[in-house]
């Protein structure tokens, strides 16, 4: 792995500082580094140390993309690097994430292992969401975590009809509807009472948000199923949110169609780390009360 792209959470001073230090370290390892113009400016990175590319092209020609930030930064970067099929490594800046599972303190040792070939690559399922209107298709969007239909500013219920592979499954009144990947099962869907799905399983979750009828429970369907739903009531201020980062207004008559994408995200993991360790730490299973985390960065001399 000789060409490394960096994606930085620009609102996080720790991530900016880490980007600067990592760029210098990678140069000492004789790796070619690429950063965004915004990150180069924020971290004061010399053009001699890194090439500059727009975020949407950061994966082009790279052997690895490293995301410095949180899960939200990782999800945004995932869509940008998807077309390049480049593996991604997530580094968290203080809080363990389900996607950014490597801590800053572990980063350098972890990268040495990666450069030595000691790593696993896991393909994460993605979804493709479509909105179909009488005027034609108005949206096609790749999603790593979830697609959520919900009300906008007012806390009111929605009514929708859900079908799978053209077969009607249920009609529900609820605060909204979540369609999630296994990766997204630990996101909004988990907060809405959905199950945790191992990321290697080929399945899609359909999860009503606070349904009016308690018998409307989350269901998991095969990954090759096509899920579609329509809103059955004429009400304003309805949105379709994609990975919690893009919102699209919904109109009367819209049909939302969701299916497994023909693309997947390649995520790098240490073979010494397992998914259940991350669940236990992130969800505080059997954690000792009062445990504190050291969020400080190590001095460069300690690496």
Curated annotation (Swiss-Prot):
What does the function comment of this entry state? Involved in the regulation of the intracellular balance of NAD and NADP, and is a key enzyme in the biosynthesis of NADP. Catalyzes specifically the phosphorylation on 2'-hydroxyl of the adenosine moiety of NAD to yield NADP.
Q: Which InterPro entries match?
A: ATP-NAD_kinase_N (IPR017438), ATP-NAD_kinase_PpnK-typ_C (IPR017437), NAD/diacylglycerol_kinase_sf (IPR016064), NADK (IPR002504)
> Which Pfam families did the record assign?
NAD_kinase, NAD_kinase_C
Kindly provide the name given to this protein in its UniProt entry.
Answer: NAD kinase
Q: Gene3D superfamilies given for it?
A: Probable inorganic polyphosphate/atp-NAD kinase, domain 1 (3.40.50.10330), Probable inorganic polyphosphate/atp-NAD kinase, domain 2 (2.60.200.30)
Active site annotated at which positions?
71
Per the UniProt record, the source organism is: Magnetococcus marinus (strain ATCC BAA-1437 / JCM 17883 / MC-1)
Task: Report the locations given in the UniProt record.
Answer: Cytoplasm
* Entry's EC annotation: 2.7.1.23
Per UniProt, the enzyme's principal EC class comes to transferase
Task: Provide the catalytic activity annotation.
Answer: NAD(+) + ATP = ADP + NADP(+) + H(+)
**Which PANTHER family does UniProt cross-reference here?**
NAD KINASE (PTHR20275:SF0)
